[in-house]
Amino acid sequence: MGKEKIINMIKDVLKQDGRIIFAYVFGSFIKEESFRDIDIGIYINNPDENIFVISSDIKTQLSIMAKKEKLDFSADQFDVKVINDAPFTFLKRVFKEGLLLIDHDPDLRTDLIEYVSLKYRECAGILTEGSSI
């Protein structure tokens, strides 16, 4: 099964959800030939909404679409994370290694990337020092 087909299916589902501003796929699905799950990071327009409900809704929609497309994926194989309040170290990894799937507000996304990059540079010495302990 081709990754491109899976990526297109994920894009189609995410485009239909008006709560999502931008989304990335990242992790082993992007970096390795074989993978156990598909990590998806979504930035939503209302972070006060219940992120577990949003994540569950999207996982359900992805599994329904996967079944229609004859792809062998269950909802549990989609790991959907709301990234609005994620730690900047995690966001750096998503932005650096991930593949952008949808982007309804490029200015917001690039502002967040710049903010994460700045925060990472500010704390790089502390992070390096802490990892050598």
Over which residues does each language-model region extend?
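Catalytic core of pol beta-like nucleotidyltransferases
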Residues: 1-22, 30-33, 49-133
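A short, glycine/Asx- and small/polar-enriched loop/turn
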Residues: 34-38
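Short hydrophobic/aromatic beta-strand micro-patches
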Residues: 41-45
